[in-house]
Amino acid sequence: MSSLARWIITIGLEVHVQLSTKLKLFSRALAENHKAPNSAVSFFDISLPGTLPIVNPEAIRLATKAALVCNCEIAPSLEFDRKHYVYSDQRAGFQITQKRRPLGTNGFVRLNAALDGVEKDQLVEIKCLQLEQDTGKTVNELNEDLVLLDFNRANVPLIEVVTAPCFHSPHDAACFLRKLQTILRLANVSDAKMELGNMRCDVNVSVASAENPTKQLATVELKNLPSIRYVEIASELEAKRQIELLNNGSSPVPETRSYDVEKNATVFLRKKRGPSDYMYLPEADIPEITLTSAYVDDVRKSIGPSVDELLETLLQKKYFNLQDAKALLQTEDGLSYYQVLVGELEKVTSSMSPDVQLKAEKLIPFWLVNEYVGDCANAPDEKRDLDTIPPADLAFLLGNLANGTLSAYAAKHILQLAVQDPKKNSIYKLVNENANAEFDENTLKDLVNELIQANGDKVNALKVGKDGVLNWFIGNVMRRSSGKAKPDEIKRLINNTVLCENSSK
């Protein structure tokens, strides 16, 4: 048995997710924590004496919805507690959270081997889901004597999702996080963007001997992990660190660590705190809030199909593969955009032949998920949202691509221009300009001849019938003609020039 095989890795997750509310949890300040520092702050958020919490009902509703989509049992009433600690980002000296009675308990998220990338089907136990306020954050440290604080994030509504220590590989933990992220996005509970800090994850890692798996050793907490990828990497490194200690005769100790990207290692932060260190007390300024069965049922009615059901529906379309279907559901507003796009494409292609209609429909996954979403993410000045280009405009582009009015290269070029400057570059305008553009045949011949003369090796490959070479020539001519040359005409010229020359020898 190898040194690694002698040990069983156990991982539990604590996932913090900001709710998509307009206002903060206990004040009337806007929940806009990514604006200019301290521009969205109320007196309560910075704990001025005499200020009292005002509960945001929208936050309670979204938290209840989150608990339901995680299959939790809902508490009959909502009670809050104070978690006491002293830190600069929490001016009150305590955080309002839930300890005695979490909003949701005994939930689960189902991981499917065929859909979620795990080795085998499993139910991830959700121990609890609680509603709490977020803290402020440190935005810059100039020196040891000066710390700048931003309280925009303070009191933004947050849910904490706590799993059982049920993962035995970092990969499965990462698969769960992707699934949870998709579930919460589709429920419109949160955008769950880890890159913005709207979803954050702490990881608890321990190892046990394979010969005595019930004997748990020390648990180490990993904090401040900014992405799912880093969760997987850091968990793997921490497990290996603990195993190395054990193999060398030492033992891990309970502590809090973080992941250092430059060192590619976990590093010590502080000794691990226990519940008694936080001196939990009931929050006396917020009375108990009853959650009636009628209220919970009303929230439940707003929940749509599950992620697995939506994936199965997309995969039944035949032209969706699993990767594209998952990417669509993981994209913020991706599903709703797709649903509108399908209807708009039907309108655009209604007068076209059934073959063209089917071709247009098959274009959707690649052009929506790979091209459009990719262009939005890689816009030169700033990342774009899906509403940059209305579904009707994208449908018009795909319809003209399907019926042969546009080449694939021209369509890509038009889409990129429209994403970069949607006000200046209307898709309708660009498509019509391209359709009406005539590319001079003599110029086209010159482009073809120039490529042929400069690429003798590819010409020889074309002569012996190597696959893909003809497409290379066509693609290069399309780029040089800004997509205006017709692929069939390019193909004809190349064949006439190269193959006729070959047959004459």
Curated annotation (Swiss-Prot):
Enzyme class: ligase
Spans through the membrane: none
Intrachain S-S bonds: none
Catalytic activity: L-glutamyl-tRNA(Gln) + L-glutamine + ATP + H2O = L-glutaminyl-tRNA(Gln) + L-glutamate + ADP + phosphate + H(+)
Keywords associated with the record: ATP-binding, Ligase, Mitochondrion, Nucleotide-binding, Protein biosynthesis
Subcellular location: Mitochondrion
Domain of life: Eukaryota
GO cellular component, one term: mitochondrion
InterPro entries linked: Asn/Gln-tRNA_amidoTrfase_suB/E, Asn/Gln-tRNA_Trfase_suB/E_cat, Asn/Gln_amidotransferase, GatB, GatB_Yqey_C_2, Gln-tRNA_amidoTrfase_suB_CS, Gln_synth/guanido_kin_cat_dom
A single GO BP: mitochondrial translation
Family: Belongs to the GatB/GatE family. GatB subfamily.
Protein name: Glutamyl-tRNA(Gln) amidotransferase subunit B, mitochondrial
Lineage: Eukaryota, Fungi, Dikarya, Ascomycota, Taphrinomycotina
